[in-house]
Curated annotation (Swiss-Prot):
<keyword id="KW-0289">Folate biosynthesis</keyword>
<protein>
    <recommendedName>
        <fullName>2-amino-4-hydroxy-6-hydroxymethyldihydropteridine pyrophosphokinase</fullName>
        <ecNumber>2.7.6.3</ecNumber>
    </recommendedName>
</protein>
<dbReference type="GO" id="GO:0016301">
    <property type="term" value="F:kinase activity"/>
</dbReference>
<comment type="pathway">
    <text>Cofactor biosynthesis; tetrahydrofolate biosynthesis; 2-amino-4-hydroxy-6-hydroxymethyl-7,8-dihydropteridine diphosphate from 7,8-dihydroneopterin triphosphate: step 4/4.</text>
</comment>
<dbReference type="GO" id="GO:0046654">
    <property type="term" value="P:tetrahydrofolate biosynthetic process"/>
</dbReference>
<keyword id="KW-0808">Transferase</keyword>
<dbReference type="GO" id="GO:0003848">
    <property type="term" value="F:2-amino-4-hydroxy-6-hydroxymethyldihydropteridine diphosphokinase activity"/>
</dbReference>
<dbReference type="InterPro" id="IPR035907">
    <property type="entry name" value="Hppk_sf"/>
</dbReference>
<comment type="similarity">
    <text>Belongs to the HPPK family.</text>
</comment>
<keyword id="KW-0067">ATP-binding</keyword>
<dbReference type="GO" id="GO:0046656">
    <property type="term" value="P:folic acid biosynthetic process"/>
</dbReference>
<keyword id="KW-0418">Kinase</keyword>
<keyword id="KW-0547">Nucleotide-binding</keyword>
<comment type="function">
    <text>Catalyzes the transfer of pyrophosphate from adenosine triphosphate (ATP) to 6-hydroxymethyl-7,8-dihydropterin, an enzymatic step in folate biosynthesis pathway.</text>
</comment>
<dbReference type="Pfam" id="PF01288">
    <property type="entry name" value="HPPK"/>
</dbReference>
<dbReference type="InterPro" id="IPR000550">
    <property type="entry name" value="Hppk"/>
</dbReference>
<dbReference type="GO" id="GO:0005524">
    <property type="term" value="F:ATP binding"/>
</dbReference>
Length: 166
């Protein structure tokens, strides 16, 4: 089994409902168990301004799937929830990013793990560290909380403090 950490985000429609539907779909993945979810945070858009605010959260799973198969499953969930990939950093019904896949490192066209921008995004690190405060970034094993300490967190507000274990 491999412990996987995901970031989920949405800024279209009923944002909280999209997060819930994504969590339900993740919990139903084959050979995978949803272990925990973070609180939900509201943040301004990153990368492209002038769009609606995002709701962001993280979750922790345990899977027997390969990283490539897990990516295919998360992309299928995104598509089933209406995700259309037409613009980089554009609005979306749901975005599911693989942040960490065990201690593994991937650098392919399809998959980059650890996620290449995670250390630059407080809206990713805050919910992620809520799940596991002593996470380290492979392969250098620097604490993720050290990256967070260097980031501006002023535009991130708690939306829902629900933290559920499965």
């Amino acid at each position: 089994m491999t412990i996987v950490y995901l970031s989920l985000g949405t800024n279209m429609g009923d944002r909280a409902a999209y997060l819930q539907k994504a969590l339900e779909a993740l919990a139903d993945l084959p050979q995978t168990r949803l272990l925990a979810q973070s609180s939900i945070y509201e943040t301004t858009a990153w990368g492209k301004t002038g769009q609606a605010d995002f709701l962001n959260m993280a979750c922790q799973l345990d899977t027997q799937l390969t990283a490539a198969d897990f990516l295919k499953e998360t992309q299928a969930i995104e598509q089933s929830l209406g995700r259309v990939r037409h613009e980089k950093w554009g609005s979306r019904t749901i975005d599911i990013d693989i942040l960490l896949f065990g201690e593994e490192v991937y650098d392919t066209k399809e998959l980059k793990v650890p996620h290449p921008y995670m250390t630059e995004r407080a809206f990713v690190l805050i919910p992620l560290l809520e799940l596991q405060s002593d996470l380290k970034l492979p392969p250098n094993h620097k604490f993720l909380r050290d990256y967070l300490a260097a980031l501006d967190q002023s535009d991130i507000t708690l939306f829902s403090a629900q933290q559920t274990e499965f």
